[in-house]
Design a protein with these regions (language model features):
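Predominantly flavin-linked oxidoreductase catalytic cores and closely associated redox partners
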Residues: 1-134
Length: 136
């Protein structure tokens, strides 16, 4: 930006842009470099829970027309997870008789034998979910 090693202005110096706004939203993704700097500079994590991560799976199903309701959105929480593990699902009925079916589980689960993929498979056995995707 036109500064030498000591921070003095060189011949090609041009000042940086000044940004003035009532609200500024930084959305660079999960744990981005700018976000880390802002959190540190403004102490944004003081007294806050740390960021949490999860693993998710998504499948696209073409289902029977009688089970399809274009535009329907469903979200669930919990089952088949135990009470100490958080997670949930989404089911989006898209066009063309398609359903986007997904499940997300927080990566802080305590059970070392828990398989997020297997939990997603088990989720699809719930009677309400099985009814939607049956024959798909």
């Amino acid at each position: 930006m036109g500064l030498d090693k000591e921070g003095n202005k060189k011949d090609g110096y041009e000042p940086g842009m000044e940004l003035h706004a009532k609200v500024t939203v930084f959305s660079e993704g999960c744990r981005g470099h700018l976000g880390k700097q802002l959190i540190k500079k403004f102490d944004l994590d003081n007294g806050k829970d740390p960021q949490q991560y999860g693993i998710g799976f998504k499948e696209i199903w073409k289902i029977d027309e009688k089970n399809h309701q274009e535009g329907l959105v469903m979200h669930t929480a919990g089952w088949p997870l135990d009470k100490n593990t958080y997670g949930g699902s989404f089911i989006y009925h898209a066009d063309n008789k398609q359903v986007f079916l997904g499940y997300v589980i927080g990566l802080d689960y305590k059970n070392p034998h828990l398989s997020p993929f297997d939990e997603f498979q088990r989720f699809k056995t719930h009677p309400a979910i099985r009814k939607i995707i049956e024959g798909g």
